[in-house]
Amino acid sequence: MTAPILVRIKRNKNDIVQNCDVYIGRQCNMGGWNLPDSKWKNPFTIKQYGSAEIVCEKYFKYIVSSDLFHDIPELKSKTIGCWCDFPVNKIITGFYCHGCVLIQLYKLIEKYDFDTHKIQSILKKAFCCD
């Protein structure tokens, strides 16, 4: 399996405890980090929309309807990092981080031999934008 792996990036004082190959978040200049906006950032915030499920659904539609969809194969075998807390001791019933959306889209694109144009067309018709 060559799908990306999602991690929560973190530091302990000046030491990086968990890093990633590709940062997928918004700009962060706190806690010793100096991270620019990632092209993969989720423009929708929980503060604005109320829940991780809602912002992940919006992110799914955003990615599916953008040219960024065609860049998803570049995440092959990468460790992607975000700030989202991983649910611990909870049953996960939906996406808790937009990184999960990227991983599932990657797996779908991989399953269909990386034909991003075909998959994007199908997803747009089924879920959002055509």
Swiss-Prot record:
* Superkingdom in the source lineage: Viruses
What Pfam family does this protein match (any one)?
Answer: DUF4326
**InterPro entries linked to this entry:** DUF4326
| Protein name as catalogued | Uncharacterized protein R718
Q: Which organism is this entry from?
A: Acanthamoeba polyphaga mimivirus (APMV)
